[in-house]
Amino acid sequence: MNLRVKNKWIIGLTGTILSGKSTALAYFAKYGAATLSADEIVAQLYKKTAIQKQLKKWLGTTQKDQIAKQIFTHPGKRKQLENFIHPLVLKEGLKQIKQAKKKLVVFEIPLLFEADCDKMTDLNILVVADPKTLPLRLKGRQMSRAIYKARLKTQWPEVEKAARADIILFHKNKKDLGAKIKRFCEAFDLF
């Protein structure tokens, strides 16, 4: 599948857990881009009866927190779910890209590189947060360091993501990230 659409510029946006992807996506929307979130698409898919039946069959639950607990502790279950859900997310993402009224579309995909989705976009941006801010970010998400580390293990290391990214947006805080995205949009005359 290809997410590229004629007369649109598709940016894949990614980063590790708690890197500021969602914040970056909000800034891109603020500065004029159409935005999509793979996590939001997944949440909508999980509401569909057919998907709920499949989740119940494989994982015994449809509760998001219980699903997360299982897939982050059982790699086989995570892989099975990813193989099932990723094509559906991409199909819905492509539909939304085609419907977008704006030429610039930023698609936040946490596993952009891991799922080889970076080959389906025009440009890929990696969001990297200052590691010194991790304790504050954990507190803001009400996430323990143990859960954070378990989830981080399911993603590629930042250095591997950086090697495949076209642009790396390193930031110290939300204000810094917003300023960098604004400059990026201005530089490319995207809003």
Label each region the model flagged.
Residues K101, K119-M120, M143-F188:
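Small-molecule kinase domains that catalyze NTP-dependent phosphoryl transfer to phosphate-bearing small molecules
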Residues M1-D65, Q70, A179-F191:
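Glycine-rich phosphate-binding loop of ATP-dependent small-molecule kinases
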Residues P87-K91, L104-P110, K149-T154:
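Short gly/ser/thr-rich secondary-structure transition/capping motifs
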Residues E40-A43, A129-K132, K153-T154, K174:
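Short, acidic/turn-prone active-site loops that include or flank metal/cofactor-
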Residues N7-K8, K101-K103:
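Short, high-confidence coil segments that cap the C-terminus of an alpha-helix
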Residues Q44-K102:
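ATP-dependent small-molecule kinase phosphotransfer cores
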Residues L94-K98, L104-G140:
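ATP-dependent NMP and nucleoside kinases share a basic, alpha-helical "lid"
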Residues Q52-K56, P131-K139, K149:
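An amphipathic alpha-helix signature
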